[in-house]
């Protein structure tokens, strides 16, 4: 008896097993995926073309807000709302998610009258969402409706309306929030990016909210925190063979050419290759000053590591000499692309 693996599809209350061997011959999944992405990309284009002055008014409202941007939604709309909150909060717009059902049972106490409330409902008729409206009006909160139905209960009671209409969901049954979820997510990103630009939100600001992980290290860490202080140094008169020995022992692929505590140059793997190409066996008779790179690039020890890395990327170099206030060499920072 042959071995079959099965995929289960839910059809109402029934569970129907379908052999994956048969399934693979039935459909071209690539075509389905491409069609889905085509529909969704077109929906994003339509959203872009549909944006009007309401969008500008919402941005101005949020910029002037002295409270928080509170976002609420149910189901997929709620999940999208949580992602919006995460983006806003990390880019300079204080924000939190308010579950409409929980809000109706006590969490409304989290609100202040100066907060702005953004409610997401594609139909605009989600009962748990709309039940909040009288309380929000009573508190004095401004309401932003994110919906496809400008004549809905939510839209009619909101102060501002952002339209997320889509022609259809890519779900074959036109039921599961797919295209509409993407459009809502993209609208949230468009709002966040506009606010970032309006506030001139810089990497240093971003770093304050992302102190952990590689991102935080790059944005908050200073050069002096990561630089190597045990440096491979040679004199201008050091011969080629001894230079190679120092570079090998230093394990950095470079040697700093120093004289009287002053930086005269740097020798990298590239300098070694160029010297050998130009001089062949005669390179053995050369000294450091003959093939070093004079006036190497430097950076101050108190600069952010991100600046050092960006500089090395731009100059296409892998090592940068670190100096102090007196312009004395105190370290070396490396970058691996």
From Swiss-Prot:
The enzyme's E.C. designation: 5.3.1.13
What organism does this protein naturally occur in? Haemophilus influenzae (strain ATCC 51907 / DSM 11121 / KW20 / Rd)
User: So where does substrate get bound?
Assistant: 92-93, 99, 105, 131-140, 165-167, 237, 290
Could you identify this protein by its name? Probable arabinose 5-phosphate isomerase
CBS domain spans which residues? Answer: 227-284, 292-337
The site (Catalytically relevant) lies at 76, 128, 169, 210
- State the Gene Ontology BP annotations: carbohydrate derivative metabolic process; carbohydrate metabolic process
Family per similarity comment? Belongs to the SIS family. GutQ/KpsF subfamily.
Catalyzed reactions: D-arabinose 5-phosphate = D-ribulose 5-phosphate
Task: Give the first-level EC class, as a single word.
Answer: isomerase
The record's annotation in InterPro entries points to:
CBS_dom, CBS_dom_sf, GutQ/KpsF_isomerases, KdsD/KpsF-type, SIS_dom, SIS_dom_sf, SIS_Kpsf
Residue sites binding Zn(2+) per the record? 99
Q: Which UniProt keywords apply?
A: Carbohydrate metabolism, CBS domain, Isomerase, Metal-binding, Repeat, Zinc
Give all residue intervals belonging to the SIS domain: 58-201
Q: Which Pfam families match?
A: CBS, SIS
Family matches, as Gene3D superfamilies: CBS-domain, Glucose-6-phosphate isomerase like protein, domain 1
- What PROSITE patterns does the database record attribute to this sequence? CBS, SIS
Q: What does this protein do?
A: Catalyzes the reversible aldol-ketol isomerization between D-ribulose 5-phosphate (Ru5P) and D-arabinose 5-phosphate (A5P).
Q: Which SUPFAM superfamilies match?
A: SIS domain (SSF53697)
What the entry lists under CDD domains is as follows: CBS_pair_SIS_assoc, SIS_Kpsf
Any single GO molecular-function term of the entry would be: carbohydrate derivative binding
């Amino acid at each position: 008896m042959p071995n079959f693996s099965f995929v289960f599809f839910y059809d109402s209350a029934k569970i129907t097993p379908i052999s994956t061997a048969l399934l693979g011959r039935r459909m071209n999944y690539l075509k389905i995926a491409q069609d889905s992405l085509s529909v969704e990309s077109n929906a994003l284009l339509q959203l872009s073309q549909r944006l009007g002055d309401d969008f500008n008014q919402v941005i101005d409202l949020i910029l002037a807000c002295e409270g928080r941007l509170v976002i609420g939604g149910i189901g997929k709309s709620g999940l999208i709302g949580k992602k919006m909150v995460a983006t806003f909060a990390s880019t300079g717009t204080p924000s939190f998610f308010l579950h409409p059902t929980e809000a109706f049972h006590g969490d409304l106490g989290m609100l202040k009258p100066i907060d702005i409330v953004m409610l997401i409902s594609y139909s605009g008729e989600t009962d748990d969402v709309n039940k909040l409206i009288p309380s929000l009006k009573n508190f004095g909160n401004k309401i932003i409706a994110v919906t496809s139905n400008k004549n809905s209960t939510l839209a009619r009671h909101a102060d501002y309306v952002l339209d997320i209409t889509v022609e259809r969901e890519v779900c074959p049954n036109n039921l599961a929030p797919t295209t509409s979820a993407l459009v809502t997510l993209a609208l949230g990103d468009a709002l966040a990016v506009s606010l970032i630009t309006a506030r001139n939100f810089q990497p240093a600001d971003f770093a304050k909210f992302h102190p952990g992980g590689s991102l935080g290290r790059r944005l908050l860490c200073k050069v002096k925190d990561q630089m190597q202080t045990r440096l491979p140094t040679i004199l201008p008169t050091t011969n080629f063979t001894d230079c190679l020995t120092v570079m090998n022992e230093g394990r950095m692929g470079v040697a700093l050419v120093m004289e009287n505590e002053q930086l005269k140059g740097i020798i990298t793997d590239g300098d070694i290759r160029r010297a050998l190409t130009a001089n062949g066996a005669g390179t053995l008779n050369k000294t450091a000053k003959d093939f070093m790179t004079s006036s190497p690039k430097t950076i101050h020890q108190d600069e952010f590591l991100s600046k050092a890395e960006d500089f090395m990327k731009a100059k296409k170099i892998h090592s940068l000499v670190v100096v102090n206030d007196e312009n004395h060499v105190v370290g070396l920072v490396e970058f691996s692309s």
